[in-house]
């Protein structure tokens, strides 16, 4: 179930670069609400509160109830821009969510049971190939993350997108379900050890074969020691 947060916003009647700079000087961040077949609405938000929400993580997958001068607008952040030098927010785009709206989001991948995976116990390393999963869901069903159980993975094995169980009401938007999510990478020297172990029986076989004739050579010598049978009388 999606987490719904609240933010307070103020209508921004003036648009343009000059008006946006004036908002930032006043400690506010310009933003816009669009979508749901309605005209866009220009707004501004308190800078400090917005920074805290962005730094908290999962900002782009969090449904927000925007309180715009007393009127609630259910939205989801679709994009935000940061100052390239000082790293503070300079603009935010919010998508208006109509009733039953379905949207595409990218959510993080969380791993489960990595400590108990056989490959990890044997010295392997968990390699996360895909850090986020693209999904399609109703606004109220957006998961905060997708959980992947890797408790059965051994060295050299992988977990694919098709192996993941999705929450109810959530669909994948990936072109292929065989996308690799996680692999267990072997430790240093593992392949050499495997080759050496595989070569040991092969090397032992010729040695065993070489000993066989020596053992068989004792048989004639034993036969030579046997007394000759007495000749029959006529």
From Swiss-Prot:
The gene is rplY. The lineage of its organism: Bacteria, Pseudomonadati, Pseudomonadota, Alphaproteobacteria, Hyphomicrobiales. InterPro entries: Rbsml_bL25/Gln-tRNA_synth_N (IPR020056), Ribosomal_bL25/Gln-tRNA_synth (IPR011035), Ribosomal_bL25_b-dom (IPR020057), Ribosomal_bL25_C (IPR037121), Ribosomal_bL25_long (IPR001021), Ribosomal_L25_dom (IPR029751), Ribosomal_uL5_bac-type (IPR020930). GO terms for cellular component: cytosolic large ribosomal subunit. Keywords: Ribonucleoprotein, Ribosomal protein, RNA-binding, rRNA-binding. It comes from the Bacteria. HAMAP family: Ribosomal_bL25_CTC (MF_01334). This is one of the proteins that binds to the 5S RNA in the ribosome where it forms part of the central protuberance. One of its GO terms (molecular function) is structural constituent of ribosome. NCBIfam families: bL25_bact_ctc, PRK05618.1-2. Part of the 50S ribosomal subunit; part of the 5S rRNA/L5/L18/L25 subcomplex. Contacts the 5S rRNA. Binds to the 5S rRNA independently of L5 and L18. One of its GO terms (biological process) is translation. The keyword RNA-binding applies. This is Large ribosomal subunit protein bL25. Belongs to the bacterial ribosomal protein bL25 family. CTC subfamily.
């Amino acid at each position: 179930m999606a987490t719904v947060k609240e933010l307070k916003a103020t209508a921004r009647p003036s648009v343009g670069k000059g008006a946006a700079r004036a908002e930032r000087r006043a400690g506010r961040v310009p933003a816009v609400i669009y979508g749901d077949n309605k005209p866009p609405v220009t707004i501004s938000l308190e800078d400090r509160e917005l920074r805290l929400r962005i730094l908290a993580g999962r900002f782009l997958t969090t449904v927000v109830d925007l309180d715009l001068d007393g009127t609630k607008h259910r939205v989801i952040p679709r994009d935000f821009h940061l100052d390239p030098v000082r790293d503070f927010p300079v603009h935010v785009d919010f998508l208006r969510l109509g009733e039953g709206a379905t949207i595409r989001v990218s959510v993080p991948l969380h791993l489960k049971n990595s400590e108990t995976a056989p490959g990890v116990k044997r010295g392997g390393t968990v390699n996360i190939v895909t850090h986020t999963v693209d999904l399609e869901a109703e606004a109220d069903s957006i998961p905060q993350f997708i959980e992947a159980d890797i408790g059965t993975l051994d060295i050299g094995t992988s977990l694919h997108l098709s192996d993941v169980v999705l929450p109810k009401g959530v669909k994948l938007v990936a072109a292929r379900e065989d996308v690799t999510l996680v692999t267990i990478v072997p430790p240093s020297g593992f392949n050499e050890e495997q080759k050496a172990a595989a070569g040991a029986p092969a090397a032992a076989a010729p040695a065993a074969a070489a000993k066989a004739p020596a053992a068989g050579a004792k048989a004639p010598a034993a036969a030579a020691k046997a007394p000759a049978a007495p000749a029959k009388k006529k």
